[in-house]
Amino acid sequence: MLRSPRRLLVLDDDPTGSQCVHDVSVAFEEDAALLRRTLAEAGSTCFVLTNTRALGEDDAVAANRRIVEGVLGGAGDAAPEGLHVVSRSDSTLRGHVIAEPNAIADVLEAAGRPVDAFLFCPAMIEAGRYTRQDVHYAVVQGEELRVEETDFAQDATFGYAHSDLREFLEEKSGGEVPADEVLSISLEDIREGGVERVVEVLAGASGRRWVVVNALEYSDMEVVADAVTELEARGRVFVTRCGPSFVRPLAGQEGARVLGGEEIRAAEGAPAAGAEPSRDAAGTAAGAQLASAASAGARAEHGLVVVGSHVGLTTRQLRAVQERGTLTEFELDVARLLDESSREAHIEETVSSIRAELGRNDCVVYTSRERVSTEDPEESLAIARSVSDAVVRVVAGVRGALPAWVVAKGGITSHEVAHRGLGIRLATVAGQFFPGQISLFRPDAAPEETLGCPYVVFPGNVGGEQALADVVDRLRSVGR
């Protein structure tokens, strides 16, 4: 791969996009000065967790605009040289596919950087998500399916009917992006023509042209990334909409870091140099005592698993954890959470019970498996936010018990648990439990009771049926 000085700003619509990279920063807040500092060095990468998949389109657009405007800076502020903005989203095509890249392009254009093309590469190789002849596929229980045939396509908010990515873009844009106007970088272009041919295809794109990137392997995406590097050196501007895999070659990384026991144990140590605790507890006597206790290894012996995702794979993974019979289970009943007369008592009872149990056993808390949704996408999002808020309150209530580790299952769940439940402002991706899947975050800026607590981000639609149980077993064995 060509070395690139690009600074990669990744707007991640849930916390799962960094699972194919390591030693990169992950910010949970929109602090413009902080983001510019993380991008100070050429070749640096910073993920900003926007959680926009949990927002309506207008709010998602506003968040994208705010972040990019902040990083570009106002009068007197120097924008990071060589900035490439990535709109990172789902490898099974959910999210605000059209609106978010356009919001980013609007800001770049206002700053004098008109966007030539949107690169669309939803692949996640490790999870069996790839694109061939412009059709996107997902391997489900060993069977290759067009993504329109999977339960991901039935999502209450972001459902879709097409797997051909050109037709998908036309569908999602309401016809504003005609399928026959979408360019394509084919596998033949990549494997037979190489960088030179891909440069030729991309050089023909202008005016925010959508370009589908076909990819079956990382080597395919590396060729495309090299072509992008060459064209950016000539002044061309691209915005990328992609799944997790394409971020790795854009960031200049050639391999994954699979964590061993020592690396997992190291995540329990001190935060990275330059990190700071959150302002809410810093400087207090109680905070100092708590930080000292946590760093001295006084965390509870047992950890907490939080499950919020409702995709079929997550339910099967939860069942595998239950079958091993090694955790105490707590169910948050969605019907009770949506009933104002029972909501508060249900949350308080759950917090109290988990805090007591962490002294004896690992715990798993999950929302009831019956999906509650309506035909109105905005109302479905409101229900999801109400349930997510309850999960966050449970975690916030439990964190003072200093769990040994926390695993969050589900994209929206893991963002909310990290930021609002555990109070994480900035973290470093230590690596993954499996190649390109399931990241371990080391909190760098967080409340003292969270510093030193390894945090595992486990997407709802990733991993084999035993993967969640295996991650819990590895965390448990490291702590012994």
Model regions: which residues?
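Cap/lid and interdomain-hinge subdomains that line or gate substrate/regulatory clefts
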Residues: 1-12, 19-22, 35-37, 42-44, ...
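Short beta-strand segments
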Residues: 11-12, 47-50, 87-88, 119-123, ...
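Gly/Ser/Thr-rich loops at beta-strand to alpha-helix junctions
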Residues: 14-17, 89-99, 125-127, 216-220, ...
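N-terminal short beta-loop-beta anion/metal-coordinating cradle
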Residues: 19-49, 349-358, 429-448
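Short acidic, glycine/serine/threonine-rich loops at helix termini
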Residues: 20-23, 96-100, 129-137, 222-227, ...
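Conserved, well-ordered active-site substructure
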Residues: 24-27, 403, 412-463, 467
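Conserved, well-structured core segments that form the ligand-binding/active-site neighborhood
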Residues: 135-274, 279-283, 287-350
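C-terminal structural cap/anchor segments
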Residues: 354, 358-411
